[in-house]
Amino acid sequence: MDEGTRTVLRKFEHIEHCLKRNVEAHATNGFEDVHFVHMSLPEIDKDEIDLSVKFLGRKFDYPIMITGMTGGTRKGEVAWKINRTLAQAAEELNIPLGVGSQRAMIEKPETWESYYVRDVAPNVFLVGNLGAPQFGRNAKRKYGVKEVLYAIEKIDADAIAIHMNPLQESVQPEGDTTFSGVLEALAEITSSIDYPVIAKETGAGVSKEVAIKLESIGVSAIDISGVGGTSWSGVEYYRAKDELGKRLALRFWDWGIKTAISLAEVRFSTNLPIIASGGMRDGITMAKALAMGASLVGIALPVLKPAAKGDVEGVIKVIKGYVEEIKNAMFLVGARNVEELRKVPIVFTGFVREWLEQRIDLQEFVKKRAKLRFEFWNVGFYSYPYTSSSTHLF
């Protein structure tokens, strides 16, 4: 079996396990330690609340992104159906959409249609996806700017996400652990293409140290994807070929940084737009993430099942439920929009507070998340952040 065929088969297995098994983290995402202060007199009307946000030069109706999940099967097969269903929902809701890793498309070009959605979603903000290990200096087939542009332009995407998944690769039977030189390769990409580059984790969170490096090389945004949602070590547990592999994946099932903690670290240490994903399962949690300084919240697993059935309305129903919950939380803290939400009081307790007090200046973080502003202007498709005298928030 050639490498491309193995990659396609792996995509089938990942989808199957996510649909049929419990692959979520056993640990929480940490937002139970983040608290709003209820306002008995919110002094706003609920009907006037505006959930629209700006991100990478585009305005969206809601601060929610469907993050990349799958791709790599042939036309008419499951990944093709999932991406087209999600795209139609994202188009109707005017929210951004990511596709899964396009490595399969590069190795098996005939699978490209499983990522292509422009015929059903001509206006959706679409984010392509490639994996960090393929950019390592010791990768079996090293990717570069050429492969990035191919991944973007073949599906007419608006941006590219480079997913950082060392945890998954380290426990995967056929994992690629060639991560040396990735930062240098990403620096070349950000300086060479006219598209936004999003650095994306895959369920283990981004630390302040990594975030600072990513900002220094010019990435446009970070998807923190922390602990608390889908565990890719958990997925690989079910794919393991022997007891040693199962034991390794089980041991690292909950490895990483909780989403709430990662969000605070990255927000405190950088001025980059942040997608907060990792266990986003209700609108109150999403509102907390936005209040902490996230530009968008990301979801994946909650909409996978209706998407696999081709149920566009089912996907929309899930997301609209989250929207109503976010809106209600904003009403109860007196926030008319996401900018005002970042100024409401929040209180940290428990493990999250203990962690953050050792890692950042927590009081300074609370002040910074309310003051941070971004202005974007475009050169081609690339968005440059500007922070000294901005007039709008994401």
From Swiss-Prot:
It comes from the Archaea. It is found in: Cytoplasm. Substrate binds at residues 10-11, 101-103, 168. Its EC number is 5.3.3.2. FMN binds at residues 67-70, 101, 129, 200, 225, 230, 279-281, 300-301. Its cofactor is FMN; NADPH; Mg(2+). It catalyses: isopentenyl diphosphate = dimethylallyl diphosphate. GO terms for cellular component: cytoplasm. Its main location: cytoplasm. GO terms for molecular function: FMN binding; isopentenyl-diphosphate delta-isomerase activity; magnesium ion binding; NADPH binding; oxidoreductase activity. Pfam families: FMN_dh. GO terms for biological process: isoprenoid biosynthetic process. Mg(2+) binds at residue 169. Keywords: Cytoplasm, Flavoprotein, FMN, Isomerase, Isoprene biosynthesis, Magnesium, Metal-binding, NADP. Belongs to the IPP isomerase type 2 family. Involved in the biosynthesis of isoprenoids. Catalyzes the 1,3-allylic rearrangement of the homoallylic substrate isopentenyl (IPP) to its allylic isomer, dimethylallyl diphosphate (DMAPP). Homooctamer. Dimer of tetramers. This is Isopentenyl-diphosphate delta-isomerase. It comes from Pyrococcus furiosus (strain ATCC 43587 / DSM 3638 / JCM 8422 / Vc1). The gene is fni.
